[in-house]
Amino acid sequence: MEPAAPSCNMIMIADQASVNAHGRHLDENRVYPSDKVPAHVANKILESGTETVRCDLTLEDMLGDYEYDDPTEEEKILMDRIADHVGNDNSDMAIKHAAGPEMNIDIVTAAASMSGITTASHSALPIRRPNTPDFRRHSEKKAKKHKNKQRQRLDDVVAKLHKPSESEADEDFIFQQPQEEEYQEEQEPQVISSSPQHFDERSPSRSSSDHGGHSGGNSRDGQFYLSSGSEDEDDEDDERVDSGYRGSSRSEDSSRYRPHGGSHSSRSSIKSSGSGSSRHHHKRKAVPERHHPFTPPSAKRYAAAAPSSRYECPVRVDSSDSDDAPTMVQRGTLKIKSFRPPSSGSNSNKHSSSSGGSTSSSHKKQQQQQAPSKKPVMSSGSDKIRDMVDRTAGGYVAPNAHKKCREDKSRKYPARALEYKNLPFRPQSPQYLLGKAIQFCKEETVHDKFIMLFYTRSQDVRKAVDETRARMGMRPNLSISCPFMTEHTKPINHSRETIDRTSAACTAGTQAVWDMEERRGQKCVPRTSDYRSMIIQAANPPDFLGAVKTCLHLSQVFPKQVCMRLCSITGGLNPLPIYEETVSSYVNAQFEADDISHHEDESGEYESDCE
């Protein structure tokens, strides 16, 4: 073997420095260890014999990022001997296994072990992984799967921690409706134990809202704005706030919260109009606030982040049962109730949290309870009339049913609403309407007059009507109806016999008209028109003129979509007795004689200011 370069850090050929270092004669034909090699390794190499070792690479080159050929048989034998010599403890067992021929280890590992470089732990060197798109995609998928698994374990632990016992679940979530006597017996000890200040803060507001009474000079105004149904409205608002957490608003008809219902079809509007029926309210037991396992995580985080148990939020209030009820957003202070599981129908009282159910099964039960009911809801509108016609007249017959399908006699074809892009009648001029309104105000006959407002259901007209209703709502002494639809029956031309019989009965008098026979000759159900109507009635002339001008401004903006008419009521009175006092006060102030003064002239005669 040729002598290696002197720069070799691991093994070098004998030279003068090596001779002086080892203190003996060295053979130039042999390979000896360098001074940088540990002593026990150098002695082992010297005692091993005449076997040669590769020394063409430095230690830095061996530990660098290079690929090496497989070691030779002589190198494997030498590495095995070194491993047997230093492999007494457990830390060198990995070196012995790595030096074996079955592991196909390269010379770098052998050189590191010979130079005394050993790791503190038993772990192997880091494995180089390929940097390919497929491998990165596989790694991301594996990491995401592991993260989801850890999150699922955490959710299970949280669900077990928050899951109440069976007795607590029955106590909290089975809502009973006790009688008033039971409720009073339960509330009496609470009132006695509570402080007077705490009792004065809550009890007067509840009693005053129930009975509509207020102390002081504003008692009459309070009676007007507070009715006996205020308690029901408050509870309905609280339930709507809770429905936002438990997601029960999906099962309700969304057209109820729109100011003009759903589609143009008569059936859709009829079904939506029947969804707002009033519910009877009973006082519930006071239950402690508790997070239910069915509560969604978003609701738990929101409740935990809330600074107090009271907060301000916009509350949606429906003031009527129809689908055209005026929708208002009112800011108020509501109390957060405890979260309740979603309920549907009559199964709400039977729902209780199961102690052994898993999270997946409880989620499925929650989705089943939130699903809307498939049972048809009978409204109090045209559906009842349709059923009555089916029972009495022998079945509903659409006007053009014979054109659609002659053979299928059992099918009932629905009649769509009479749709009009523009109003089907010609409106009157604003000058004529304003002149008539002034004439009514001169005659002091406003109490038996009212305004009829008709408009189509286009989007821009509907928004303008809502703004007009809001402006009129700020005026006093007005009675404004909710927008409503009109039903129309089938037009039929009367025969000559019917005309003569009616004329003879009217000539004979009231008894003849009362005894006159009526002949019904049609079986069709009334059809609704898609345009809406409103009635506005005022108590005094200033309020009547203000409402007339507001409606005239709207009709001038939409001359073909909005129409206003003035109507008279035979023997009309105020819609509510609360306006009687303001009408009397207006009349008395107009014809009051206290301000009329009399002046005496020089001749001794009296002269009035009215002359």
Swiss-Prot record:
Return the Acidic residues bias intervals: 230-240
The principal location of this protein is host cell
Q: Specify residue ranges for compositional bias: Basic residues.
A: 138-151
Q: Where is the composition biased (Basic and acidic residues)?
A: 198-213
InterPro entries, per database record: Herpes_IE2_3
Q: Which GO terms describe its cellular component?
A: host cell nucleus
Q: Where is this region: Disordered?
A: 119-155, 180-383
Task: List compositional bias (Low complexity) regions by residue number.
Answer: 260-277, 341-376
Q: Which UniProt keywords apply?
A: Activator, Early protein, G1/S host cell cycle checkpoint dysregulation by virus, Host nucleus, Host-virus interaction, Modulation of host cell cycle by virus, Phosphoprotein, Transcription, Transcription regulation
Cellular localisation: Host nucleus
Q: What does this protein do?
A: Strong transcriptional activator of the E1 promoter, shows an autoregulatory function by repression of the IE1/IE3 promoter. The IE1 protein has some additive effect on the trans-activating properties of the IE3 protein.
The protein's name is Immediate-early protein 3
What organism is recorded for this protein?
Answer: Murid herpesvirus 1 (strain Smith)
